[in-house]
Amino acid sequence: KQDPMLTTEKVTELEAKLDRLKNYSRPKAAEEVRRLAELGDFSENVEYQLAKGKLRGINSAMLTIEHQLKNAEIIEPNTQHEQVAIGHHVTIEGGGKPKTYLILGSIETKPEQGVISHVSPLGSALIGKKVGETVELKIAGKEVSYKITKIE
């Protein structure tokens, strides 16, 4: 089951992508399939098979995005900073310099940019905690602990 948590920015991005697929990519791909179908023998027509595959891929992408948008739960800006919640920036310390993470839904996760999912091991350990609390978890088979120093 896909995580439904999305920011309004991600919803806007998905709506734009769906619009491009519906109004540009799909009609163009469908026209290419029609053009190649007119050439006759489908079994020997590699271009036709590739065009059909591309059209199936576009249709699949459209269905996925439509499903994501239909089931989306918008991450509302949270002005309460007592406890860690989805949408918060959380600064933690442990084993080196402080690190700040933004906790979002799994569709928007970019760990290399400090964006983690609320269902990731670290994200789920942080949810509901307060400044000053320590979370302990196992990462790559190793016990680690982090102290929460700031919630924004």
Spans of model-derived segments:
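Residue-level signal for pocket-adjacent positions within structured domains
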Residues: 1, 16, 31, 37, ...
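N-terminal cationic and glycine-rich segments that engage phosphates or anionic surfaces
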Residues: 1-57
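Conserved, well-folded catalytic cores of nucleic-acid-processing
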Residues: 21-24, 36-39, 65-72, 129
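Internal alpha/beta loop-helix hairpins
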Residues: 46, 50, 55-78, 82
